[in-house]
Amino acid sequence: MNLTEYPYSSGRRVVMGCNHAAATSQPLATLAGMEMFWAGGNAVDAAIAIAIALTVVEPTSNGIGSDAFALVWDGQLHGLNASGRSPQNLTIDRFDGMTQVPDLGWLPITVPGAVSAWRTLWEKWGKLPFEQLFAPAIRYAESGFPVSPETARAWKWTESLLANAIEPEFQWFQQTFLPKGRSPHAGEIWGSRAHAETLREIAATGGESFYRGRLAERMAAFAADTGGLLTQADLAQHQADWVQPISTDYRGITLWEIPPNGQGI
């Protein structure tokens, strides 16, 4: 492979190094990964720290309530599917009269699996203390950080969808992510102490609070109060699954991916 010539137009540059490398869509998230390397951690420590940091610095694309998939090579390829299941009380009749699953509200919500991925990956390969992986993200959330232009654009789009929503399930989104009644502008400093407190509790309990403790109780209570179907039982029964990766050959290259239910990109 020629690393200095591209068959297409690109403004990106090849970055080389001798020991470690981290690449993300956000420099502060990349820095979170590098901090783990500098502390003596390995690639899995760095990847988890990056994923946690992205819930803060790119909340429009990543979240504590999201799912996660992972491919890890340690001499052989491992696949992890940490996507969540639908709530047990979500029956097919609730979609009567609909032609597709709605984009907003409680109906499309599944059990959030990302936290279980962080814990599961760390248990198998992590080298640093679990709580240490959260330190950069907590720092960004508490002290604030400059919002990137791309994130500001996505945030503005989300504002257009939810700023005037009157349904009770959107109240905390508006208070947290539209604190001035609008989305933050590019370069504006934004942070969330509540986000930091949540991450700190996840870190201190090894993720247990999120699925079987205080955070799980709060999520289930909020769902019950606002018309959601997610329960403490749904959260407690969640687990990440080790899966066999699938592959295909394309132009002499073998491409590996997580099998369905992921979309494979």
Task: Please annotate each region the language model reported.
Residues 1-31, 35-38, 43-205, 210-212, ...:
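Noncatalytic scaffold domains of N-terminal-nucleophile
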Residues 265:
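Flexible, polar/acidic helix-loop-strand segments at domain edges
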